[in-house]
Amino acid sequence: MATTEKPVLSKYRDRMDKAVAALKEEFGSLRTGRASASLLDQIHVDAYGSSMPLTQVAAVSVPEPRMITVNVWDRGMVVSVEKAIRQSDLGLNPVVDGQTLRIPIPPLTEERRKDLAKIAGRYAEQQRVAVRNIRRDANEDLRKAQKDNVISQDEEKRMETEVQKMTDEAIKRIDEALKTKEQEIMQV
């Protein structure tokens, strides 16, 4: 019979923190009315015979609130970078200026804002589910440890309460991040 270790709650807290961080990263790729360098993080460019992230072939900066500039390091890659940005589903139209691409960020329509808010809500729900799954894993480990007499019943209940507190805290942070992102999206 395999021995059961005493469950360590910090590993579950770390996993929940990673779920919240992943949500914030996903939110970064959602287009709002303002320019953000992270908007282009998901774009891959066909470069040197393979698909590479845009950040590996160019420097992305935000000189103005509604403008992103992409400084391509290799002059021969400008066309590929422009093509990748145009083909992305972000609806952006870069303007080529030598080795620099200027990408004006058009204002969002009300309909598009609502769609983005729904997408943000979907991302948040995915992470809430992930946090709940982590809670389930933690509680299963606690039950197994109690069953194998590694921890007492009282300790199991105390730790389950702690796991629930961690879950509530993580979901609260997810909800706060969603609220902030929705406000950012709906801001005209």
UniProtKB/Swiss-Prot annotation:
GO terms for biological process: cytoplasmic translational termination. The keyword Ribosomal protein does not apply. Gene3D superfamilies: 3.30.1360.40, Ribosome-recycling factor. One of its GO terms (cellular component) is cytosol. It is found in: Cytoplasm. Disulfide bonds: none annotated. One of its GO terms (molecular function) is ribosomal large subunit binding. Coiled coil: none annotated. Keywords: Cytoplasm, Protein biosynthesis. NCBIfam families: frr (TIGR00496). This is Ribosome-recycling factor.
